[in-house]
């Protein structure tokens, strides 16, 4: 990044944002508040890592408003797709192996990420869908009109690839896609690259499997 201000927010319940009665374990975190749409943790995570993060960055570096971009990987990619359509301050986005896309498919596909905890919860209780239908990144992507680059994986045991491609296919604005190898499979040092000049970037990553 050249001449760019970056902010790396921590979603509530995770890492330095641990606490407030929200479990940090990925399998428990993704189920927190799922009984009611108004209480589901993903809504708060969207506010933390996109809207509030952008406000904090722009308060410190107001000149970044002319070029505010978003970079999200896995969990951050899905949260970005959920939240970006409702924030007009962003100019571009890069979503790498984005999660939370096409929940009807996600609930039918076994995996090793915390999405598996959601799938099992739905199988056991039948109560997840009423909330999840309001937190589908592929549905939200239908309203995302800024230019977006998506790096989706054809194989990903943690984030089902059909959900990743569903987000890309649903994008309403200019889009560009590429194939990605998930960082959790590519080894140390693997990362996405995005160029930013004279602007601000909100970056959201996680080393956990979501």
Language-model features, listed with the residues they occupy:
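Cap/lid segment of the alpha/beta-hydrolase catalytic domain
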Residues: 5-47
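Gly/Ser-rich "nucleophile elbow"/oxyanion-hole loop immediately N-terminal to the catalytic nucleophile
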Residues: 29-74
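Active-site nucleophile elbow and catalytic-triad environment of alpha/beta-hydrolase enzymes
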Residues: 125-140
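Acidic catalytic loop of the alpha/beta-hydrolase fold
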Residues: 154-159, 185
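Histidine-bearing beta->alpha loop at or near hydrolase active sites
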Residues: 174-200
């Amino acid at each position: 990044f050249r001449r760019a201000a970056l902010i790396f927010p921590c979603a509530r319940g995770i890492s330095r944002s641990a606490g407030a009665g929200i479990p940090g374990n990925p399998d428990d975190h993704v189920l927190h508040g799922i009984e009611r749409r108004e209480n589901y943790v993903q809504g708060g995570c969207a506010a933390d890592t996109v809207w509030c993060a952008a406000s904090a960055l722009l308060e410190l570096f107001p000149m970044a408003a002319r070029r505010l971009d978003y970079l999200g990987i896995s969990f951050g990619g899905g949260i970005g797709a959920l939240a970006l359509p409702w924030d007009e301050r962003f100019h571009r986005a890069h979503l790498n192996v984005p999660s939370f896309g096409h929940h009807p498919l996600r609930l039918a596909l076994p995996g090793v990420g915390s999405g598996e905890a959601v799938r099992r919860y739905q199988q056991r209780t039948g109560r997840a869908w009423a909330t999840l239908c309001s937190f589908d990144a592929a549905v939200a992507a239908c309203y995302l009109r800024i230019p977006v680059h998506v790096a989706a994986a054809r194989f990903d045991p943690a984030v089902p690839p059909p959900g990743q491609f569903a987000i890309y296919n649903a994008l309403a604005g200019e889009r560009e896609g590429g194939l990605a190898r998930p960082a959790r499979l590519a080894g140390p040092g693997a990362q996405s690259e995005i160029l930013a000049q004279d602007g601000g970037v909100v970056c959201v990553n996680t080393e956990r499997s979501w």
